[in-house]
Amino acid sequence: MTKIITSPSFITQLREQIEYPNAGVFSKVLLKDNACQYTLFCLAANTDISEHTSIRNATINVIEGRGLLTLSGEDIVLENGIFVFMPANAPHALKAEENLTFLLTLSEKVTDKN
């Protein structure tokens, strides 16, 4: 389900969008435009996402579950209500300790024009 923005608003109940796979990752792009993309990630317990980077800034907003994010070498416990900002090109990895759902927002990296 991807919704391209055609009106000024979009509303959904995130908990109704959650779908856990038996193993691994299920992701669903909820909304995107030229500057941002909003993707719901549902990870089955014991799922690992190996270290990688992104050319875009990102935020993680945890909806439910528990996991561990390693961001630029720092371990961050992910649990309901946690919000994390990840700058573009920051190395990060993730392990879902139990079923874990979060909203990932990708946004354009702002270039310093000075």
Q: Where do the protein language model's features map onto the residues?
A:
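Conserved short histidine dyad/triad with adjacent acidic residue
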Residues: 24, 37-54
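Glycine- and acidic-residue-biased ligand/ion/polar-headgroup-sensing regions
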Residues: 56-68, 72
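A cytosolic small-molecule/anion-sensing beta-strand core signal
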Residues: 63-64, 79-80, 98
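Short acidic-glycine-tyrosine-enriched beta hairpin
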Residues: 73-88
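A short, N-terminal "cap"/entry segment at the start of jelly-roll beta-barrel domains
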Residues: 1-35, 70
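Ligand-binding loop in jelly-roll beta-barrel domains
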Residues: 88-111
